Amino acid sequence: MALVPCQVLRVAILLSYCSILCNYKAIEMPSHQTYGGSWKFLTFIDLVIQAVFFGICVLTDLSSLLTRGSGNQEQERQLRKLISLRDWTLAVLAFPVGVFVVAVFWTIYAYDREMIYPRLLDNFIPGWLNHGMHTTVLPFILIEMRTSHHQYPSRSSGLAAICTFSVGYILWVCWIHHVTGMWVYPFLEHIGSGARIIFFGSTTILMNFLYLLGEVLNSYIWDTQRSIEEEKEKPKLE
C-alpha cells in the first residue's frame, strides 16, 4: 500500500522540477544569452540532475509495477539495471550536488547576497522560483532518501565520481572566464587568485564530505527502520 503514495509523490516532484525548469528557461535574462547560457550555473545543472533523477525514479516505479508477478527474467534484469542507475544517481549526483547548492547559496546569500544573487535578479526571477531552485531541492531529496532504500556504490568509486564532477565543473567555470574574461559568480571577481584556488579546493572537499554524509544518512535511516521492523516482529511477552 505504501508504494502508491511514493509513486504519486515522485511524479509530483518530477512535475514540479519540470515546471521550475520551464519557467526559468522562459525568463529573458542577459546572462542566458552569453557564453555557456544557463549551463554555466551550478543551480541550473543541479535542477537538470534532480529532474533526471526523479524521472528515473518514476520510470523505475512504473517498471516495477509492470513486472510485478510477471516472472519475466529479462524484464526483471532491466528493472535491476534501472534501480542501480537510480541509486547511483542519488548517491553521486542528486544528494551531494543538491545539498551543496542549497548550503553554499544560502550561506553566501546570508553573508552578502550581492556576491551570489544580486538584487537586480529580483526583477527577473520571482521569489517562488528562487526557492524552487535553491530551497525545495533539500527536502525533496531527503523525502526520497527516507521513502526508499538506496544502495550506495563502493566508497572509492563514488568519491572518484563526485571528484570528477567537481573538477569538471571547476574547469568549466575557469574556461568560461578564459573565454569571456568574466567569472560566473560575482564573488569570484572580488577575491585573489590564491583565494580562488583555496575556494575551488574547498568546494571539492565539501562535495566529498556531502557524499559521505549521504552514505551515512542513508545507512542510519534504513538501519533504524530495519531495527523497528525487527522489534515489531518479535513476539510480545505476556
From Swiss-Prot:
InterPro entries cross-referenced by the UniProt entry: ADTRP_AIG1
EC number: 3.1.-.-
Transmembrane portions of the chain: 13-30, 45-67, 88-110, 125-144, 157-179, 194-216
Lipid metabolism listed as a keyword: yes
Keyword terms, alphabetized: Cell membrane, Hydrolase, Lipid metabolism, Membrane, Transmembrane, Transmembrane helix
Recorded topology in the membrane: Multi-pass membrane protein
Subcellular location: Cell membrane
Origin: domain of life: Eukaryota
GO MF annotation, one: hydrolase activity
Major location category of this protein: membrane
GO cellular-component term (any): plasma membrane
GO terms (BP aspect): long-chain fatty acid catabolic process
Catalytic reactions of this protein: 9-hexadecanoyloxy-octadecanoate + H2O = 9-hydroxy-octadecanoate + hexadecanoate + H(+); 12-hexadecanoyloxy-octadecanoate + H2O = 12-hydroxyoctadecanoate + hexadecanoate + H(+); 9-(9Z-hexadecenoyloxy)-octadecanoate + H2O = (9Z)-hexadecenoate + 9-hydroxy-octadecanoate + H(+); 12-(9Z-hexadecenoyloxy)-octadecanoate + H2O = 12-hydroxyoctadecanoate + (9Z)-hexadecenoate + H(+)
Family to which the UniProt record says this protein belongs: Belongs to the AIG1 family.
Function of the molecule: Hydrolyzes bioactive fatty-acid esters of hydroxy-fatty acids (FAHFAs), but not other major classes of lipids. Shows a preference for FAHFAs with branching distal from the carboxylate head group of the lipids.
Protein name: Androgen-induced gene 1 protein
Organism of provenance: Mus musculus
